Amino acid sequence: MNKPARQLRIREIIQQEHVENQHDLLRLLKEKGVKVAQATLSRDCAELGIIRSKTHAGYRLLFAEEHSGRIIKGLVGMEVVSVAANETSVIVRTLPGRAHGVGSWLDQFHSPLILGTIAGDDTVLVIPDSVENISALISYIHKNLSTN
């Protein structure tokens, strides 16, 4: 099996299975008919950005971007003081000096619910795509700023 196909299989397994370590990953690959040496698997994991991380259910192999994304989400969530809305817009209050980071975090998702954000020192004005979507936008903001 060539490298791109093997790495695709590795990616699929990591996304679909609870894999605690490279030994388990090696076993799962073998069960799927993929022959690979431990050293090659280790290099593939490094190239794919796979890390071993402690979760609530024990250790698990994860993609580094997923792990760091959850950490950043939790940190950004801790910077938010409140979320409020009126008939036309949503206001996210933050700790002093943190509004720009929270606004940037929301912008990176390119949500169709958000027309744009404007950040001051401790306040982010979130402009919805439509006033009819205010409640959906509030739910979306809570979901993406939750530490869970």
From Swiss-Prot:
GO BP field: L-arginine biosynthetic process; protein complex oligomerization; regulation of arginine biosynthetic process
Subcellular locations according to the entry: Cytoplasm
**Gene Ontology CC annotations of this record:** cytoplasm
SUPFAM superfamilies per UniProt = C-terminal domain of arginine repressor (SSF55252), Winged helix' DNA-binding domain (SSF46785)
Q: Give any GO molecular function from the UniProt entry.
A: DNA-binding transcription factor activity
Keyword list (alphabetical) reads:
Amino-acid biosynthesis, Arginine biosynthesis, Cytoplasm, DNA-binding, Repressor, Transcription, Transcription regulation
From the UniProt record, give the pathway where this protein acts.
Amino-acid biosynthesis; L-arginine biosynthesis [regulation]
Main localization (coarse): cytoplasm
Role this protein plays: Regulates arginine biosynthesis genes.
Family, similarity comment: Belongs to the ArgR family.
Its name, as the record gives it, is Arginine repressor
Give the species.
Chlorobium phaeovibrioides (strain DSM 265 / 1930) (Prosthecochloris vibrioformis (strain DSM 265))
